[in-house]
């Protein structure tokens, strides 16, 4: 019924080496493909919001609030400390990151007597206006980041810090 199909030694080795070579090439290319597609495959879900302060405690003067977030890095989970300068600007709540956009130092509110009512970075004399905008002629080239925020049940919840105008 069916004829015997003989395969030569040369064809057998050719098929075997092609198969093994293809498997090895695929195993080398797979990490590169995964690396290239990783940003596309990441979830774009909103970061967990953390309760920081009661809205009733906020004033027109910026106040620093410290809070902690849970950070998962592969198999390692840790608690990371964060800070925010928070104040009311009319009906709006403003939450700014205290990280200077020049070299990553921490800014303070109203701490430089020569420049009152400004955020001041003591490392390289960087200045920011109350709304987080960088003062021209000082080292920072970008405004302070703004935190994602949400008010729920009378409390302010903060998420991820993003550059001004983004989000």
Swiss-Prot record:
Details of cofactor binding: Binds 1 [2Fe-2S] cluster per subunit.
A GO cellular-component term linked to this record: plasma membrane
Taxonomy, superkingdom: Bacteria
Keyword Repeat: no
Binding site for [2Fe-2S] cluster: 100, 102, 121, 124
Domain spans labelled Rieske: 59-158
A single MF term (Gene Ontology): monooxygenase activity
S-S bonds: 105-123
Family annotation (InterPro entries): Rieske_2Fe-2S (IPR017941), Rieske_2Fe-2S_sf (IPR036922), Rieske_Fe-S_prot (IPR014349), TAT_signal (IPR006311)
Cofactor field: [2Fe-2S] cluster
UniProt keyword annotations, A-Z: 2Fe-2S, Disulfide bond, Electron transport, Iron, Iron-sulfur, Metal-binding, Oxidoreductase, Transport
CDD domains: Rieske
Pfam families membership: Rieske
Quaternary state and interactors: The main subunits of the menaquinol:cytochrome c complex are a Rieske-type iron-sulfur protein (QcrA), a cytochrome b (QcrB) and a cytochrome c (QcrC).
Family: Belongs to the Rieske iron-sulfur protein family.
Task performed by this protein: Component of the menaquinol:cytochrome c reductase complex. The Rieske protein is a high potential 2Fe-2S protein.
Protein name as catalogued: Menaquinol:cytochrome c reductase iron-sulfur subunit
Source organism of this protein record: Bacillus subtilis (strain 168)
